[in-house]
Amino acid sequence: GDRLYITAGVTAPTDSRHYPYCASWLDVEGRWTDLERPTKEGGWLSKHVTVFRDATSVVEDIFDSSHLFVTSGSHGVFEYRDGRLVNQYTQGNSCIESCSGSKSHDFVRTDAGIMDKDGSLFVANNSVDTVIWCRKPDGVWIPFFHEPVSKAGFFEKVIIDSKGRLWFANRRTDGNVSGGVLCIDYGQTVDNATDDVYTFRH
């Protein structure tokens, strides 16, 4: 598109660093626009979350540039329409999970968002059993479970190549999962797991 999107968050190995939630875009005329920030006052899980932080990636809907998704390193995925926050996908209202033993809403780690040609949104849900999830345009969530990367904590970057394959980069070794690159060839059929081919190189 004709926008440059940025986020100002990070997933720190020891939770030693965090940044206020910030997601913005730069248009062709050089103007910056900030997306609405989630607040307690706005009703976004105010009973559970203390401070919203760490926006990590922005995904523009390929069919509607006013429709965006923002992943965050602490609070799941946020959905926007016309710059306004309309939804949050997190522990309890979606398949995305918290990585903490107490299932705290402050540890719902998501990153590496991307959308395929059919409008299906892929995100990494780090440090849990099923790390890669797909949200179809109809709102149904589909798991992409691969045992060798289960509980990987640092899937932060992703691309889709010319053959429609997903390439996720795990930045560093974390527990039993090495840093490396995961390729998912799902045959561009998110509902059919029988043709999925996973390759993890580290």
What are these regions (language model features)?
Residues 1-202:
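Carboxylate-rich, polar loop motifs that coordinate divalent cations or form catalytic acidic clusters
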